[in-house]
Amino acid sequence: MRDIKTYLSVAPVLTTLWFGSLAGLLIEINRLFPDALTFSFFSF
């Protein structure tokens, strides 16, 4: 029972950290490459 409580308290923290870092990474990518729909190396 104690292991289940430990898992239930660790999983939301890890999920929050993961999605927070993923959101930060996506924000920084969109800041560096603002128009990601048309990359310059795709236009021939």
From Swiss-Prot:
Location within or outside the cell: Plastid, Chloroplast thylakoid membrane
Gene Ontology CC: chloroplast thylakoid membrane; photosystem I
Keyword Thylakoid: yes
Matches recorded under InterPro entries: PSI_PsaJ (IPR002615), PSI_PsaJ_sf (IPR036062)
Membrane topology note: Single-pass membrane protein
UniProt keyword annotation of Protease present: no
Residues that span the membrane, as ranges: 7-27
Record keywords: Chloroplast, Membrane, Photosynthesis, Photosystem I, Plastid, Thylakoid, Transmembrane, Transmembrane helix
GO terms for biological process, alphabetical: photosynthesis
Function: May help in the organization of the PsaE and PsaF subunits.
Alphabetized HAMAP family for the sequence: PSI_PsaJ (MF_00522)
Record-linked PANTHER family: PHOTOSYSTEM I REACTION CENTER SUBUNIT IX, PTHR36082
Family: Belongs to the PsaJ family.
Name under which the protein is recorded: Photosystem I reaction center subunit IX
Source organism of the structure: Drimys granadensis
Lineage: Eukaryota, Viridiplantae, Streptophyta, Embryophyta, Tracheophyta
